[in-house]
């Protein structure tokens, strides 16, 4: 039986502690849109998206009004476009036309973002994969809502270093051609190892080929709720700390489960998963870094940070998994620098470095996220950073990713203003020693010995 205390507690979570449902993401399979004629492919894609997603935004608003729970984003993810466009696209320009079709469809149905301008190349690249990757700078320039991702490695297949090298060059080019835009194209691109098929979060969402024709995935967010709960147990031992995080994560996830089931019923689309991630925003009091400080650190990045984050990540999963029938996606604690005021403060104070962030990614989802680096950083250095992060994912059998923002014309200490949920990022120093010879070897890094389970 629900008591009045629980009602008041949930109300406070929403009104005072920034509890929200970060996204309802409708995954749509485009495999039945494949055709050898490019015009037909574009027509099929537009028609399918605008038909299946026509009520997504209105349904989200209706659920918001009914339950007074903010739903920040309504999004779409689609089948990786390298698979869909492979038969019709003979050039990078052909793929850009599909990106523009996705953008047009997203605007027609009113969603915030559409993800899936993607390629899966963990063991090798087809011609279509390569063309799509090379088209990303132009696609990011000519679209507003399209998000892109490439999976370059997995525990089972190793790391495709040819793709890693190409993506380093592509990120540099994307930063250059989109430098005049309000949001850098690099903020809408993620490179993955062990990318999940059911991720509702951008920019890395795509609708995996293992999925149904359409599916509803929901991402919840509640760093402020967790921090407020921990304020009440200051000085208590780790057992009390962990129990508090678990109970809070259960409540937050239960809200997501409610929204997901309602959206599924109203749209007539099966419920997929709840992503258990704690996703911060630039708002004061909505920070993962602040939770780490509440656990006992002076600043995120201090000794003990990796242990505190590991504890947080694990307890969020333990609590959240009991609150939903299906969990998946990335599920953990995001540590994006630009989207978390506590992280920004830690960087500005000299407490948090790129190398410490890399260590933190060993124990949480998802990786080096929304990190501004000097605009003159070499493409091979970017590839080296990506390779390091992919290796962490490959060896530890977890999802890792990089979303790096080369800030053209800016150097260490400058600030990149991105705006909205993406916030702003101080430009962080990058190790200047060369990895050119390593990146230029070519080929792939083999899968680790413990990947052989058969």
Curated annotation (Swiss-Prot):
<dbReference type="Pfam" id="PF05167">
    <property type="entry name" value="DUF711"/>
</dbReference>
<comment type="similarity">
    <text>Belongs to the UPF0210 family.</text>
</comment>
<dbReference type="InterPro" id="IPR007841">
    <property type="entry name" value="UPF0210"/>
</dbReference>
<protein>
    <recommendedName>
        <fullName>UPF0210 protein EUBREC_1565</fullName>
    </recommendedName>
</protein>
<comment type="subunit">
    <text>Homodimer.</text>
</comment>
């Amino acid at each position: 039986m629900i008591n009045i205390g629980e009602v008041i507690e949930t109300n406070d979570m929403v009104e005072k502690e920034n509890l929200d449902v970060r996204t309802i993401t409708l995954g749509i399979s485009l495999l039945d849109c494949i055709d050898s004629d490019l015009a037909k492919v574009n027509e099929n894609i537009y028609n399918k998206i605008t038909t299946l997603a026509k009520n997504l935004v209105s349904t989200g608003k209706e659920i918001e009004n009914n339950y007074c729970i903010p739903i920040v984003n309504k999004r779409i993810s689609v089948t990786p476009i390298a698979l869909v466009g492979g038969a019709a696209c003979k050039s990078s320009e052909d793929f850009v036309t599909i990106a523009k079709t996705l953008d047009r469809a997203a605007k027609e149905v009113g969603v915030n973002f559409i993800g899936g301008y993607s390629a899966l190349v963990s063991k090798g690249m087809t011609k279509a994969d390569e063309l799509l990757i090379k088209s990303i700078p132009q696609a990011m320039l000519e679209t507003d809502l399209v998000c892109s991702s490439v999976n370059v490695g997995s525990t089972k297949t190793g790391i495709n270093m040819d793709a890693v090298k190409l993506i380093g060059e592509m990120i540099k080019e994307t930063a250059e051609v989109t430098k005049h835009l309000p949001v850098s194209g690099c903020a809408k691109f993620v490179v993955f190892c062990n990318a999940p098929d059911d991720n509702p979060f951008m920019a890395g969402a795509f609708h995996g080929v293992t999925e149904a024709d359409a599916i509803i995935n929901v991402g919840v967010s509640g760093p402020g709720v967790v921090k407020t709960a921990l304020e009440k147990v200051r000085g208590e031992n780790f057992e009390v700390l962990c129990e508090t995080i678990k109970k809070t994560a259960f409540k937050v996830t239960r809200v997501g489960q409610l929204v997901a089931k309602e959206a599924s019923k109203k749209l007539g689309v099966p419920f997929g998963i709840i992503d258990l991630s704690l996703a911060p925003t630039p708002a004061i009091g909505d920070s993962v870094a602040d939770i780490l400080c509440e656990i006992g650190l002076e600043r995120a990045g201090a000794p003990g940070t990796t242990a505190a984050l590991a504890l947080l990540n694990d307890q969020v999963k333990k609590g959240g998994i009991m609150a939903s029938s299906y969990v998946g996606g990335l599920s953990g604690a995001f540590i994006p620098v630009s989207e978390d005021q506590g992280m920004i403060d830690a960087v500005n104070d000299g407490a948090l470095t790129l190398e410490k962030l890399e260590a933190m990614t060993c124990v949480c989802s998802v990786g080096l996220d929304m990190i501004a680096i000097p605009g003159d950083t070499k493409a091979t250095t970017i590839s080296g950073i990506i390779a390091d992060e992919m290796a962490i994912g490959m060896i530890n059998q977890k999802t890792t990713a990089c979303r790096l923002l080369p800030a053209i014309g800016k150097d260490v200490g400058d600030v990149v203003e991105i705006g909205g949920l993406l916030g702003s990022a101080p430009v962080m120093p990058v190790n200047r020693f060369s990895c050119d010879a390593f990146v230029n070897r070519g080929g792939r890094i083999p899968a680790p010995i413990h990947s052989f389970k058969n």
